[in-house]
């Protein structure tokens, strides 16, 4: 069911089968998650995962982006000790900061502007806040754009991740999760 419209979504048999009379429109069926994934659904206990952040200092890189901001929303709803949003884009960081401050006024929220490319900046953040868990979502993700700027993709996605790994090791961070998606270049 669509959350905004309340409409029930159904899947139609293939056009070839419809045209050849092999099936008819009465064979409409509700859409399953398997239809969208193209594989079986993996069962994950989200409550257990999110409860893990309770009381901990959490750093979310790329916290203002599409993936990072959703991570911040989910984490904020499970009472972290401190949530640190780290993003290079102040507008995105500001927007999620305002949203979370309105929804969770008691949240210990720190918003920092900077780049994962800057190891010294990362070191200062780790020294000041000593994160328990890092969710790394700072990345260039639009493959066609990065194909024409591969040096920028490498500096941000590879070296930025490397900087975080070095700092996490140095500061003995307990857990680190990297969020990315893989796409085959054209």
Positions of predicted regions on the chain:
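Glycine-rich phosphate-binding loop and adjoining beta1-alpha1-beta2 segment
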Residues: 87-104
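Flexible, Lys/Arg-rich cytosolic regulatory linkers and terminal tails that connect or flank
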Residues: 2-57, 64
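Conserved Rossmann-fold cofactor-binding substructure of NAD(P)-dependent oxidoreductases
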Residues: 114-130
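Conserved small/polar residues in nucleotide/adenosyl-binding loops
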Residues: 180-186
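Conserved NAD(P)H cofactor-binding loop of Rossmann-fold oxidoreductase domains
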Residues: 138-141
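NAD(P)-cofactor binding segment of oxidoreductase domains
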Residues: 2-12, 82-89, 128, 133, ...
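Rossmann-fold cofactor-recognition segment
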Residues: 104-117
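N-terminal Rossmann NAD(P)H-binding glycine-rich loop of SDR-like oxidoreductase domains
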Residues: 64, 69-73
